Regions:
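Membrane-embedded, hydrophobic transmembrane alpha-helices
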Residues: 1-107, 118, 463, 601-605, ...
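Signature aromatic-anchored transmembrane alpha helix within multi-pass, membrane-resident enzymes
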Residues: 113-123, 275-285, 300-307, 326-329, ...
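Hydrophobic, aromatic-rich transmembrane alpha-helices
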Residues: 26, 209-210, 316, 404-446, ...
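Hydrophobic/aromatic-rich transmembrane helices and adjacent perimembrane loops
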Residues: 148, 153, 246-249, 289-299, ...
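Membrane-proximal, lumen/periplasm-facing interface regions of secretory-pathway glyco-
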Residues: 139-143, 148-150, 506-557, 571-575
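Transmembrane-helix signature of polytopic, membrane-embedded enzymes
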Residues: 33-42, 192-193, 209-234, 251, ...
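Extracytoplasmic
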Residues: 556-606, 625-633
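Transmembrane alpha-helix segments characteristic
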Residues: 45-49, 121-127, 224-230, 284, ...
């Protein structure tokens, strides 16, 4: 890629991003809560929401090209600047920025000096860590290489969102995360920064924990301690750049929880509430999550429980009835233009929340394809090679798994969380004792704990027990971090020495959490060195040796970019690395079985338009591997060009 082309692509990305961010600000104005931190969560949520919606609409119409996206964005910017209503809103941005900086400065000065120093060092080191890992390493997490980023690669290549032939049927799964990831690839036509797609959810989760802490009555500094604790949680920190969708579900869930708790707390404190904005923002967060991963439905009972019981007695139910009536009244008082805009926001949310399931229902008869759905053995939706069950056996199996993983002593904490919870030093060292103390002292923490537990049980009722099941509950450590925030405020003022000891323990635990995630707890120095020796734009996932069979690197080495590369893997095999980091390699699935003759396999390759066929141990069925080796040994029409790479003569 020439410097001129790179500049043009970056300019297109800047124009498109500017349009989305300004549009998000216009949409944000009627949704404001009046709490600066929560307003930050709402704005970030809207930015992610509108980016995903823009990508989906452009992709469905075949417009996922930098120039086309920039042209649409430029036209949108012209409309925003020309329309009197939006132009007036945009003029307020400088004043809003000034006000926001003033709030940040006030919070900063309110923090103790040691906490300011810790924050500055933590933000600096975290930013450096994120930047280095995103720049140095290609994607390497298993599910991303099978289907998450495979969708992204195909959409980027094709310029449109569509289904394509592949043995990995999980490409049918809800793909709102992939929409956001595509925003980080389509302009550069490269995956060099695709890992950064997880950072908005990471920031949203941290800010939401801070907001929940404030709604629970903690001071700003205590809420910030809780937010820092969650930011350092290894499972959350590692997942942020792991190119998977679970951090996004966690971020949206915590944002919805922060919004719901804020509405629950408003009337009791005498503060005015933007009921319409709070309810709509909560709905958008949950709809965005629904189009990301279906298990958000299993988290809802816990969220509802917290919202319903946040106030004692029956006052919460009356409070929510008042919020609903206020929201209707506010909507009626809005101008026609404002009502239209809010209606379009809700329609966009419904589209993002339901598109993937409706598409699957139309095409396969099952909205949750490729998963069959059964409840205690009774089938609800039959079509699919995988099964999503709601069964007590799964619940008990997952609880046994959690008990065995508790303490994170079995294995290192890694991106897929094999045999660990990933909760880390802060949770087990300080957060867990703080939670036990808080359950005795604070009613609202008991309600919060009950809701978190209900959501945890909901996920474990349906999730298949496995070594990796804790990645679905990376939001759960936030409970212990909030308990720590409450303890921080209620620590007796006279026990200064003990308080300093607690601060030292907190800093030490944060440092240990950070250190263990520097290399994802698995990437060796040699693996870093092998990547850094390559130019930044040539760090293909196929040549990263962490978990990659040799045949993928052979494909990069021996197959020309302009050739069509055939592949044969099973339904959990790597596909994404075959596209290369710049998405220059066109690929095609070549189905065959061990019963096919060598000539039949070669004919199948010819029908697909390719001379090349890649297979790999652990990714291709053993019987197919054996068949190709036999064809090569017998000197038939197929020969092995390099390990795992076959060509027709």
């Amino acid at each position: 890629m020439s410097a001129l082309e790179l500049t043009a692509r970056l300019a297109a990305w800047l124009v498109a991003s500017g349009f989305v961010l300004l549009l998000a600000y216009v949409a944000f104005r009627p949704l404001r809560s009046g709490r600066p931190a929560l307003d930050g969560v709402i704005y970030l949520l809207l930015a992610v929401f509108l980016t995903s919606l823009f990508t989906l609409l452009a992709g469905l119409f075949g417009l996922l090209r930098p120039a086309l996206l920039a042209a649409i964005a430029a036209a949108g910017l012209a409309v925003l600047l020309a329309a009197p209503g939006s132009r007036g809103v945009l003029r307020q941005i400088p004043q809003e920025l000034k006000s926001g900086l003033s709030v940040c400065r006030h919070l900063w000065l309110e923090l103790p000096r040691w906490l300011r120093l810790l924050t500055a060092v933590g933000i600096g080191l975290s930013a450096a860590r994120f930047a280095f890992l995103i720049w140095a390493l290609p994607p390497f997490v298993w599910d991303s290489l099978t289907y998450h980023l495979t969708n992204v690669a195909h959409w980027t290549q094709a310029g449109r969102i569509e289904l394509f032939e592949t043995p990995v049927d999980r490409i049918y799964s809800p793909a709102n995360y992939e929409l956001l990831a595509a925003w980080f690839t389509v302009f550069l036509h490269h995956d060099v920064v695709v890992e950064a797609a997880g950072l908005p959810a990471y920031l949203m989760g941290i800010a939401s924990v801070y907001c929940i802490g404030r709604s629970l009555g903690t001071s700003r500094s205590a809420a910030w301690v809780g937010a820092l604790a969650y930011a350092s949680t290894p499972a959350w920190l590692i997942a942020a750049t792991g190119t998977k969708n679970d951090p996004h579900v966690a971020g949206y869930f915590l944002a919805a929880l922060a919004l719901a708790i804020d509405l629950s707390a408003r009337r009791s404190s005498g503060r005015a509430a933007n009921s319409l904005g709070g309810i709509l923002s909560t709905a958008l967060a949950l709809l965005l999550a629904a189009g990301t991963k279906a298990y958000i439905a299993h988290l809802l009972p816990g969220l509802i429980l917290i919202a319903a019981l946040h106030q004692p007695g029956w006052s919460s139910l009356q409070l929510w009835r008042n919020h609903l009536s206020d929201a209707v009244r506010q909507l009626r008082q809005e101008t026609v233009r404002a009502r239209t805009g809010l209606g379009l926001l809700l329609c966009g949310g419904l589209l993002l929340g339901s598109y993937w399931n409706i598409r699957n229902w139309i095409l396969t008869g099952n909205p949750f394809y490729p998963y069959e759905v059964t409840v205690e053995g009774a089938p609800i939706f039959r079509t699919g090679d995988r099964t999503a069950r709601l069964e007590l056996d799964r619940l008990f199996g997952n609880l046994e798994n959690l008990a065995s993983k508790f303490g994170d002593k079995q294995d290192p904490i890694r991106p897929d969380l094999p045999n660990t919870t990933g909760w880390g030093w802060v949770v087990y060292g300080i957060g867990l004792p703080a939670a036990l103390w808080g359950l005795i002292r604070r009613r609202r923490l008991r309600v919060l704990s009950a809701g978190f537990l209900v959501s945890l049980l909901g996920v474990m009722l349906s999730n298949r027990p496995s070594p990796w099941n804790m990645r679905y509950v990376i939001w759960f450590p936030a409970l212990f971090c909030l308990a720590l925030a409450i303890l921080w405020d209620e620590w007796p003022a006279g026990m200064r020495l003990a308080r300093r000891g607690l601060a030292v323990l907190f800093v030490l635990a944060l440092g240990l959490n950070f250190v263990m995630t520097l290399n994802y707890n698995k990437i060796s120095a040699d693996e870093f060195r092998s990547m850094l020796e390559l130019p930044a734009l040539r760090r293909d996932a196929a040549v990263f040796e962490d978990n990659m069979p040799r045949s993928y690197a052979n494909a990069v080495e021996f197959v020309p970019n302009d050739a069509l590369l055939g592949y044969n893997v099973h339904n959990n095999g790597f596909i994404y690395p075959l596209y290369r980091s710049d998405y220059s390699q066109n690929i095609v699935f070549v189905p065959f079985s061990a019963e096919d003759t060598c000539e039949a396999i070669a004919e199948r390759m010819k029908e697909r338009g390719t001379r090349y066929l890649l297979v790999a141990p652990e990714h291709t069925h053993n019987s197919n591997l054996a068949r190709l080796r036999e064809c090569s040994r017998q000197e038939t029409v197929i020969r092995e060009r390099a390990q795992g790479l076959y060509v027709t003569r």
